[in-house]
Amino acid sequence: MTLKIFIERPVLSTVISVILVILGILGLIAMPITQYPEIAPPTVQVSASYPGANADVVLNSVIVPLEEQINGVENMTYMTSTAGNDGSASITVFFKQGTNPDLDAVNVQNRVSRATPLLPADVTRSGVVTSKRQSSMVMVFSINSSNKSFDGTFLQNYANINVIPMLKRVNGVGDVQAFGTQDYSMRIWLRPDAMASYGLVPDDITNALAEQNIEAAPGKIGENSNQSFQFVLKYKGRLKLPVEYENIIIKADSTGQLLRLKDVARVELGSLDYSVTMSTDNKPSIVMGVFQAAGTNAHAMIKECDSVIATAARSFPPGVSMNMIFTANQFLDISIHKVVETLIEAFILVSIVVFVFLQDLRSTLIPAIAVPVAIVGTFFFLNLFGFTINLLTLFALVLAIGIVVDDAIVVVEAVHAKLDQHAPTATEATLTAMNEISGAVISITLVMAAVFVPVTFITGSVGVFYKQFGLTLAVAILISAVNALTLSPALCALLLRPHHENALRQKGFLQRFYSAFNAAFGATTKKYKRSIQFLARRRWIAGLAVLVFIGLFAFLLKVTPAGFVPNEDQSFIMADVSLPPASSLERTTKIADQVMTIARQQPEMNSVVRVAGSGILSGGAGGSYGSLFMNLKDWDLRKGEEHSLTAVINKLFGATAGIKGAKIFFIAPPTLEGFGNTSGF
């Protein structure tokens, strides 16, 4: 018999288990850590800018031509688009689950290139950017200034030079987006009265700028000649100072008098756009969001981004600081830690239960060794399947502990039964027992696999959940069966002793505990038998109980709220402020500041960031939109249901109900990264 080899050669069984453990540890080290499996469909974003255009113009002249060409790209499911009154255009293309995001981005870029000739010249000049990224932010942080000499424009440009380029180089970062475009720009404010008196139109100013503010290649002199020297000519290039722009010549008359730009306009160094204002706890700031590229390791990416930001913060100017508003790792780390704790607790509880019922330390040791081998070995196959360490796979392993221990217990109990029948040695008892139960162990394993394997064929985003959960359990059960046929019999032959050797024992605490437990368990068993006999004589009671439970199940199924995944307290709240159309930025800022003041008064609040000019739910930019980002205190400081995220959101709704002239919504970030910008919808 094949199993005899493993029983008589325990080293072989041990080597098999050690190999499984080593492979499992290697797989565990190599596997990425995520909160949930990668189920969000790959997305590709196309963004463009049409300076000076409103939302209608952007929609008709930019978005429509792009959508017409992008529509129908390979593996596309649908797309969404937004147009802002600041001239911004954004199209997000969603693809089928499991497609290659790199190939999707290439296909979209090819379609965008077809639409480029149809776009306005100003749009093509500023560029149409195609990037692969998820729709939700995995990190939000702000750079603040307590120094009055550093305003938002300075912070934006400092970040553009010293922070954003470093973050974009991090592996897994799809995009780093700053709210608003406060890049340093030369602002030319035309004076209509002066323009009219000289008979000028804005195109005259634009043409003069295009002719005189250029990068030129003047060439060389003295090349290929009989001169002794040759020189490369240098041109000063684009203008940099306001006074240089002021002296741009607009036109000249026949007498030689020159009309300069300063005669018809005011020139100053300012911001490219004034449609967005930001503040953190009433201090000037800029807010940036980090987006994940599809198919990357979010946990490792966020850790590297944290390191990059910490390095950059060490060289910030005096009075400038960084404030981390939200990071997906904060909730992920504590979630994984709690599940690992549960995993360890489950193993300890199972070991205690096994010890209480088997009432023998040697017998308890066998399942206690077999369970870790099955659990750790599972990680090798999970890594082979391309899975991640996430809440689903860890939860499956928690359940697997209670399942895989059964195989080892079956083997131990079977060997004990043979020892009770006066088998001379543990080896002979193990051989006899395995001859009888090996078929049962294999059949039980196949039945359990038949339960979990079929659900892995479900497709779509939901199918990814079932696949990782089902295969994790199936693999753990299969490894447990291998242990039950190799390691557990070998350990039984080595550790167990014939019962007559242990017949006489000194009465101690454990023996008294065993006697009391067995007596109580025996009494419970007798009561259970009597209840079964009672129900056997009155079958209608059992039938009625079944019907009641079915009815209760149907009722609970109907009244229990349904959802894809439960909402989680991630210590982060977002607020969307929406005013009537055509509302000014100043009006939006005042209302957003009111909301920020109310939010800061909440005892659970850590910091609040206000962004006026950009909305969350609308996804667009404009003077009538605003948003807030609120970072709550750690969970240890918010114990109790009254301090939970849901409770804080409800309190904020109540506290801001008196603010008139605006719609204010408080929302939590999405539980699943890449599935929208918010949760609860």
Which ranges hold each PLM region?
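Small-residue transmembrane helix packing/gating motifs
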Residues: 273-296
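Helix-loop junctions and hydrophobic alpha-helical segments within the transmembrane domains
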Residues: 325, 332, 336, 412, ...
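Hydrophobic transmembrane alpha-helices and their membrane-interface caps
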Residues: 23-35, 45, 348-416, 457, ...
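Membrane-helix entry/capping segments
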Residues: 291-296, 302-349, 381, 389
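Surface-exposed amphipathic alpha-helical segments in non-transmembrane regions
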Residues: 14, 21, 26, 30, ...
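Signature of alpha-helical transmembrane segments and their immediate interfacial
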Residues: 1-33, 437, 507-565, 651
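Transmembrane helices with small-residue packing motifs
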Residues: 11, 19-57, 113-123, 387, ...
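Transmembrane alpha-helices and their membrane-interface boundaries in multi-pass membrane transporters
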Residues: 401-415, 438-457, 464-514, 628
